[in-house]
Curated annotation (Swiss-Prot):
Organism domain of life: Viruses
GO process annotations (BP): virion assembly
Keywords attached to this entry: Host cytoplasm, Host Golgi apparatus, Host nucleus, Virion, Virion tegument
Annotated S-S bridges: none
Complex formation: Interacts (via C-terminus) with the large tegument protein/LTP (via N-terminus).
Family in the record: Belongs to the herpesviridae inner tegument protein family.
Organism in which the protein naturally occurs: Equine herpesvirus 1 (strain Ab4p)
Segments of this protein annotated with the region Interaction with large tegument protein: 539-1020
Cited function: Plays an essential role in cytoplasmic secondary envelopment during viral egress. Interacts with the capsid via the large tegument protein/LTP and participates in its transport to the host trans-Golgi network (TGN) where secondary envelopment occurs. Modulates tegumentation and capsid accumulation at the viral assembly complex.
InterPro entries to which the protein is assigned, alphabetical: Herpes_UL37 (IPR005655), HSV_ITP (IPR034738)
Official protein name in the record: Inner tegument protein
Main localisation: virion
Cellular-component GO terms for this entry: host cell Golgi apparatus; host cell nucleus; viral tegument
Location in the cell: Virion tegument; Host cytoplasm; Host nucleus; Host Golgi apparatus, Host trans-Golgi network
Length: 1020
C-alpha cells in the first residue's frame, strides 16, 4: 500500500486518534466514528504489507491496548477478532530474514512472543471479557511458534555442525527430508503459511541439500567394488565440489591427499598415455585438471607446469571398453573420455564398441531416473553413475555443441545428416535432466520458495533447449513429466485449508458473541478476502468455503424498504473523502449494493485508469482503491468478488512504489489489464441494475488506448524489456566480435606463416624459416616437431574459439526469438494506440525494436560464416597437414618400437608414399602465394615459435653424452644435449648396456631394511 507508514502503524495511529491511549473510560462512538473504526480495522485485515520484528515488538502493546478499547467502545465482530487474534495476525505479517545470524534472529522472535503473551496484554483481554484461548491468540501462538522456533534452532545447530569435514567419515548421513520434516509437523499447520516459517524452510534447504550428492560421492569413492580409476575420479569430483583449495581446512587437504595418493598407486599403468604420445592430441582444461592430479598423486594439483613432460590419463575410446579400468556402472565418472567419444564420429570398431557401452550405461541410468519418485532416488541414480553436477554440465555442452555443428553443417550443404546417434541422445537426455535436477536440488523443500523455483525452471526448459529436445528423442513435455515424478513440489496444502478454517472458526465465534448491524460481518469479508487472495497469489489455489455456497452475485432489485429516490440520493453522497455519509440503514439494505458498486467502485476504477504511471499519481489512486475496497465491509457482501479483485489490483501495483521497486514486465501489464477488465465487468453489471434515469454512463473497457495508466505501464514494460534486450545483445556482440577477431587473427597468422619459405636442415630434424625474398636472413631455426606442435596449438585454439562462437550464436538465436516476440507485441500496441499521444511513443519503440532485430540477424549471419563447414575458412589445408603428420608419426612410432618391425616399416613406407602423391597432386592446383612484408611474416613466426627454443647454428650435427653427474655448477654441463641429436660414447654398449655394470656390487633391499631395523632397535 502506498502509505507513509505500514498498515500496523497506520492502525495504531487511527485507533489512537479515535479512542485515545489513556487508561480512561472509553468514549461513546457516533455512527460516523464507528464506521471509521470498522474501516480502519478492515484496512489492516486486508493489507498485504509486512512488518519487521523490531517494529512489531514496539507497536504490539499499544495495538493490543487500543484493540481492547475498540471492542469496549463498539462490541463489533471486527474489534473482537482484532483483539483476540492480534498475535497471529501480526505474526502473519512478520518478515524475518534468517540468512544472517540465525540464532540472534530466533532470539528476536522469542522476545516478540514474550511481549505478545505478556501479563498486561492477557489481563486486558480478560478484563474486557475477551478470550485468550483463540486459535491465533497470544496463548496458542506462544505455544506453537515457540515450539517451532526451538525446532528450527535445533535444526540449524545440526546444520551448522554438518560440514564436509565432519561428514566425510560419518557412518550414516541423514536424509535431507529429515531436517525439514520436523518444521512442517501437523502441530504447526496454523503457522505453515506465515512468511517467517516459509523463509525458515528456504534457509534449511539451502544449508542442508548439498549433503545428498556429497554422501553419494563419498560412497562412490569408498566403494571397493569399483575400479581404482573410477574411485579416484569420484574423489576428485568430491574435492572440486566440497573441498576446494582456499576453503578446505589444512587437515582435510592433507587427509584427502593421502587417501588420493594411496588410491592412485593402485591404478593400472594401462590407464595412462605413454610419455612419447602425451602431446599427440589436444586436451580440454578439465582433462588437464584430472590428469595433473592423478599423475602428481595430489588432488590439489590442477595443471602441469609449462615445459614439463608428464603422463596423462587416457581418454580414448578403448578405455571405455575396459571393465578393468573403468567400472561399467559409473562410466560417466570419466566424463572427459565420454565427452571426447561423443564429440567425434569415428567409424572404427573400438569406437563403436565404446559407444555401445556408453549408450547402455546411460540408458540404464535414464530408466532409473524415469522410475524415481523422490529427489533422493533420482540424485542417487545420477551420482552413482558418474553424472555429477559438473559432469552433467560437461556432457550437456558437448551434446549441444555437436548438435549445433550438425545443424550448421546440414544447412551448409545438401544431403547432410543432422541427427544425433543413440549414444549422444541418451547421454544428452541424462545430462540435461541431471543438470536441471541439481539446480532444483539447491532449493528443494516443502515451502513456497521451491514452488517458485520449480515453476520458473520448468517454464524455461522449452525456450532454452528448443529443437534439441526433439533431436534427443524426447516427446513434448517429456523432460517436464520426468522431473514431475521425482522433483515436483510437495507443499502441505491441507495446512493452508486448516489455517482458513481456523480463521473461519474464530469469525463464527466472535459473530455469535457480538451483534453488528447488517447481515454481513466486515471482519469476515475483509479477513477471508485477504486470505483467499493470499492463497491464490502465493500458492495458486482457491479454497472453497466450508458451506460450499456459491459466490454471491448482484441480483436485480425486487424489494426494498427505500424508494429509488432514497437510494439515488444516498448514492449521490458516496465519494472519496466525503464528509457527509449516507445513512447507515440505507447502506445495510441489500438493495443498495448496486448503487455502492456503481459509485464507489466506479470512482476507484476511474482513478486507477486515469492516473499516470508515476509514484505520486499511483499513490493517490491506491488510496481511492483502498477506500473502495474497505467501504461498507460490514454491510455489503463481496459480490462478484469485487473486494478480492480490488485487493489483487492493490497488491499488484503497490510494489512499484517501493524504493527497490521491481521493473515492470509485460506479464505485470497483462495481469493488471486482465484484473481491471474483471473489475469493469462488475461495474457494468452494477450500473445495469440502476434505474435508467439515474444510470451513469457505462465506462469503456480498460485498454492501452483508453487508459493512461495502462498505456504508461505497457510503455514502461516495453521500454525496459527493449533496454534489457539491447544490453544483452551488446554484451553478446562484444563476445562474438572478440571471438571472431581471435579466429580471424589466428587464421591470418597461419596463412602468413605458411607463406614463409621453410627449408630443412639435414641431420638436425629442424627447419629454417625464411621470409619470401631469397636474399633475406632467416627468422630462425626450430625443430620440426616444435613447428608442428605450434601449428597444432594455433589450430586447436581456433577450434576452441569456434566452439565458444557457436555457443554465443546459439544464445544470440534465443535473443533473436525474444526480440521477434517483443517486436510483434510492440507492433500490436502501436496499432492499438494509433491516434493517441502514446501512439507516437510506441511507434518510436517499434522503430528501435526493428533496428535491434535487423542488427541481431546481421550479426548472426556474419558469425555463421565462420561456423559453416567442418573447418574454419582457410584452415582446411592446415587440418590436412596435421592429419598427415599425425598418421606418419604414429606409423613411425610403430616402426621403431613395435614387435613386428617389418610390417610396420612397410606400412610407414606406404603412408609416406600416399602422402607424397597427395602433395604432388595438390601442388599442381596451388594458386600463387600472396606477398607479405617481412614485418608481417616475422610477427606471424614470433607468435607461433616465440615460446620454443631455437636450434643452435654450428657445424656439428650431434653431441656426445658426458659422464657429468651430481651437478654443482651448470657452467660445465653440456647443454647441447637439449638441442641436438645425442651420440653415445664409444665405451658404452647402447644395446646390451655397459658390461662393467654387471660386475659391480649393489646394495640389496634386504640389507637396506636390516640396517633400518638395526637403527630403530638400538634406539629403544
Amino acid at each position: 500500500m502506498a502509505r507513509e507508514h505500514g498498515s500496523m502503524r497506520a492502525l495504531v495511529n487511527s485507533l489512537a486518534g479515535l479512542l485515545g491511549e489513556t487508561d480512561t473510560e472509553v468514549p461513546s462512538l457516533e455512527p460516523a466514528m464507528l464506521m471509521v473504526l470498522k474501516s480502519s480495522i478492515s484496512e489492516f485485515f486486508l493489507s498485504t504489507d509486512t512488518v519487521s520484528v523490531d517494529e512489531a515488538a514496539e507497536l504490539f502493546p499499544r495495538l493490543q491496548f487500543l484493540a481492547c478499547r475498540a471492542y469496549a467502545a463498539s462490541h463489533t465482530p471486527d474489534a473482537a477478532m482484532l483483539a483476540e487474534n492480534l498475535a497471529g495476525l501480526v505474526l502473519w505479517r512478520i518478515h524475518q530474514n534468517w540468512t544472517d545470524r540465525e540464532m540472534e534472529a530466533v532470539d528476536q522472535m522469542f522476545v516478540l512472543l514474550e511481549i505478545m503473551n505478556g501479563e498486561s496484554g492477557v489481563y486486558m483481554l480478560s478484563n474486557n471479557n475477551l478470550r485468550i484461548s483463540a486459535k491465533y491468540g497470544p496463548s496458542n501462538m506462544h505455544l506453537i511458534v515457540s515450539t517451532w522456533l526451538d525446532t528450527f534452532r535445533n535444526v540449524m545447530s545440526v546444520a551448522a555442525k554438518s560440514t564436509p569435514d565432519s561428514l566425510f567419515n560419518s557412518k550414516r548421513m541423514e536424509s535431507i527430508e529429515e531436517f525439514s520434516k520436523p518444521l512442517v509437523h501437523a502441530k504447526f499447520n496454523l503457522i505453515y503459511d506465515m512468511p517467517f516459517v516459509q523463509e525458515g524452510l528456504r534457509i534449511v534447504a539451502k544449508k542442508i541439500n548439498w549433503i545428498l550428492p556429497f554422501g553419494l560421492m563419498v560412497k562412490g569413492y569408498k566403494d571397493m567394488s569399483m575400479a581404482p580409476l573410477t574411485r579416484a575420479l569420484f574423489l576428485l569430483s568430491l574435492v572440486d565440489s566440497y573441498f576446494p583449495k582456499g576453503t578446505a581446512t589444512e587437515g582435510s587437504m592433507k587427509a584427502l591427499t593421502a587417501y588420493f595418493r594411496e588410491l592412485v598407486r593402485t591404478i593400472d599403468n594401462s590407464a595412462f598415455v605413454p610419455i612419447t604420445e602425451v602431446n599427440a592430441t589436444p586436451r580440454t582444461a578439465y582433462e588437464v585438471r584430472v590428469s595433473s592430479a592423478i599423475v602428481h598423486q595430489n588432488p590439489y594439483v590442477t595443471d602441469t607446469k609449462a615445459g614439463m613432460v608428464a603422463e596423462r590419463v587416457r581418454t580414448d575410446a578403448e578405455i571405455l571398453t575396459s571393465g578393468a579400468l573403468l567400472s561399467s556402472g559409473a562410466l560417466s565418472a570419466h566424463a572427459t573420455a565420454v565427452a571426447k567419444l561423443l564429440s567425434s564420429n569415428e567409424p572404427d570398431d573400438v569406437s563403436s564398441r565404446a559407444r555401445a557401452r556408453v549408450a547402455e550405461h546411460a540408458s540404464n541410468t535414464w530408466e532409473t531416473i524415469q522410475a524415481s519418485t523422490t529427489p533422493t532416488q533420482v540424485v542417487e541414480a545420477l551420482v552413482t553413475a558418474g553424472f555429477t553436477s559438473t559432469h552433467c554440465g560437461i556432457l550437456e555442452r558437448v551434446v549441444v555443441d555437436y548438435f549445433t555443428r550438425l545443424r550448421s553443417t546440414a544447412n551448409s550443404g545438401p544431403g547432410r545428416n543432422d541427427s544425433l546417434d543413440y549414444a549422444q541422445q541418451v547421454v544428452g537426455c541424462v545430462a540435461i535432466v541431471g543438470g536441471v535436477v541439481f539446480r532444483l536440488l539447491l532449493s528443494y523443500g516443502f515451502g513456497l520458495d521451491y514452488i517458485r523455483d520449480y515453476t520458473t525452471t520448468i517454464s524455461t526448459l522449452e525456450p532454452v533447449y528448443n529443437e534439441l529436445l526433439s533431436a534427443l528423442g524426447l516427446a513434448d513435455k517429456g523432460v517436464e513429466q520426468t522431473l514431475k515424478r521425482s522433483m515436483a513440489p510437495r507443499p502441505y496444502m491441507n495446512y493452508i485449508s486448516a489455517a482458513r478454517a481456523a480463521l473461519d472458526d474464530e469469525l463464527l465465534i466472535v459473530e455469535k458473541r457480538t451483534t453488528g448491524p447488517g447481515t454481513h460481518s466486515a471482519a469476515r469479508e475483509s479477513l477471508l478476502t485477504w486470505f483467499d487472495f493470499r492463497a491464490r497469489d502465493r500458492w495458486g489455489v482457491r479454497i472453497p468455503d466450508r458451506d460450499t455456497t456459491s459466490t454471491q452475485v448482484l441480483a436485480p432489485i425486487t424489494a426494498s424498504l427505500y424508494s429509488d429516490d432514497d437510494l439515488i440520493a444516498a448514492a449521490s453522497k458516496l465519494s472519496f473523502d466525503a464528509l457527509d455519509a449516507p445513512p447507515t440503514q440505507i447502506i445495510d439494505d441489500p438493495s443498495f449494493a448496486p448503487y455502492m458498486l456503481a459509485t464507489v467502485v466506479l470512482d476507484a476504477f476511474n482513478a486507477i485508469l486515469t492516473s499516470r504511471f508515476s509514484a505520486d499519481s499511483v499513490s493517490q489512486a491506491l488510496r481511492v482503491l483502498s477506500w473502495a475496497r474497505d467501504y461498507g465491509a460490514g454491510s455489503i457482501a463481496n459480490v462478484d468478488g469485487y473486494r478480492t479483485k480490488l485487493t489483487a489490483i492493490i497488491a499488484s501495483v503497490s510494489p512499484f512504489l517501493q524504493k527497490d521497486a521491481p521493473t515492470p514486465t509485460m506479464a505485470h501489464a497483462n495481469n493488471l489489464e486482465a484484473l481491471l477488465g474483471e473489475l469493469h465487468s462488475v461495474v457494468v453489471a452494477a450500473i445495469a441494475l440502476i434505474p435508467e434515469r439515474a444510470r451513469m454512463p457505462v465506462p469503456e473497457r480498460p485498454s492501452v488506448k483508453t487508459s493512461t495508466f495502462l498505456a504508461g505501464l505497457f510503455l514502461t514494460a516495453v521500454y525496459k524489456r527493449l533496454e534489457t534486450l539491447v544490453g544483452h545483445t551488446a554484451e553478446l556482440t562484444n563476445n562474438i566480435l572478440g571471438t571472431a577477431s581471435g579466429i580471424v587473427s589466428s587464421i591470418v597468422t597461419l596463412n602468413r606463416f605458411f607463406n614463409c619459405r621453410i627449408m630443412p636442415v639435414m641431420g638436425h630434424y629442424a627447419v629454417l624459416i625464411y621470409p619470401q625474398s631469397a636474399q633475406s636472413a632467416p627468422f630462425g631455426r626450430w625443430r620440426l616437431v616444435d613447428v608442428v606442435d605450434a601449428v597444432g596449438s594455433i589450430y586447436n585454439e581456433v577450434s576452441d574459439l569456434r566452439a565458444d562462437l557457436r555457443a554465443d550464436v546459439v544464445t544470440l538465436k534465443g535473443d533473436i526469438t525474444s526480440a521477434a516476440e517483443a517486436l510483434q507485441e510492440c507492433e500490436a500496441l502501436a496499432v492499438k494506440t494509433e491516434g493517441t499521444r502514446f501512439g507516437k511513443l510506441f511507434n518510436s519503440l517499434l522503430t528501435r525494436h526493428t533496428q535491434l532485430a535487423r542488427a541481431q540477424r546481421g550479426l548472426a549471419i556474419r558469425a555463421g560464416k565462420l561456423l559453416g563447414g567442418s573447418e574454419a575458412p582457410g584452415l582446411k589445408h592446415v587440418n590436412t597437414f596435421l592429419q598427415r603428420w599425425g598418421a606418419i608419426s604414429v606409423m613411425y612410432q610403430k616402426a621403431t618400437s613395435g614387435s613386428t618391425p617389418e610390417v610396420n616399416i612397410t606400412s610407414l613406407a606406404n603412408t609416406l608414399r600416399h602422402v607424397w602423391d597427395e602433395v604432388q597432386q595438390e601442388r599442381k592446383a596451388t594458386p600463387p602465394s600472396r606477398k607479405f612484408s617481412n614485418r608481417d611474416l616475422g610477427l606471424a613466426v614470433e607468435r607461433l615459435m616465440g615460446g620454443y627454443p631455437e636450434v643452435l647454428d654450428d657445424d656439428s650435427n650431434s653431441t656426445a653424452l658426458t659422464p657429468k653427474f651430481n651437478v654443482d655448477s651448470w657452467n660445465s654441463v653440456n647443454m647441447d644435449a637439449l638441442r641436438k641429436r645425442v651420440t653415445m660414447p664409444a665405451n658404452i654398449d647402447s644395446i646390451r648396456g655397459n658390461d662393467s655394470l654387471a660386475t659391480r656390487e649393489y646394495l640389496k633391499k634386504e640389507d637396506l631394511l636390516a640396517e633400518i631395523d638395526a637403527i630403530f632397535n638400538n634406539t629403544k
